[in-house]
UniProtKB/Swiss-Prot annotation:
This is Large ribosomal subunit protein bL17. GO terms for biological process: translation. Belongs to the bacterial ribosomal protein bL17 family. PANTHER family: LARGE RIBOSOMAL SUBUNIT PROTEIN BL17M, RIBOSOMAL PROTEIN L17. The keyword Ribosomal protein applies. Part of the 50S ribosomal subunit. Contacts protein L32. The keyword Transmembrane does not apply. InterPro entries: Ribosomal_bL17 (IPR000456), Ribosomal_bL17_CS (IPR047859), Ribosomal_bL17_sf (IPR036373). Keywords: Ribonucleoprotein, Ribosomal protein. GO terms for cellular component: cytosolic large ribosomal subunit. One of its GO terms (molecular function) is structural constituent of ribosome.
Amino acid sequence: MRHRKSGRQLNRNSSHRQAMFRNMAGSLVRHEIIKTTLPKAKELRRVVEPLITLAKTDSVANRRLAFARTRDNEIVAKLFNELGPRFASRAGGYTRILKCGFRAGDNAPMAYIELVDRAEPKAEAAAE
């Protein structure tokens, strides 16, 4: 029985799931928007939101915790130097999921997951 077991299995073993979400979290922090399937996007929220909350208070211990979860110094630097200060006044809810139709090959529901206060460089350039 799977009573009270949280999280989706996504037809992967635990090490594959952990590696996949570690990579996806890094991509989301790096690019601030990624396109993936809807169930993966909903699970990715559970990985990324605590990372950003951790980055709001900059300390060596928090940087080490973030590195243990992402294994990428570039991602840790962006979390603590850019995203932590950007979301300092926001109490959670750092990501947004936008549904974007279905994938052509297998009709899987697709979604964009993005950071809420994401800067849009194309819109700013067009306005000028």
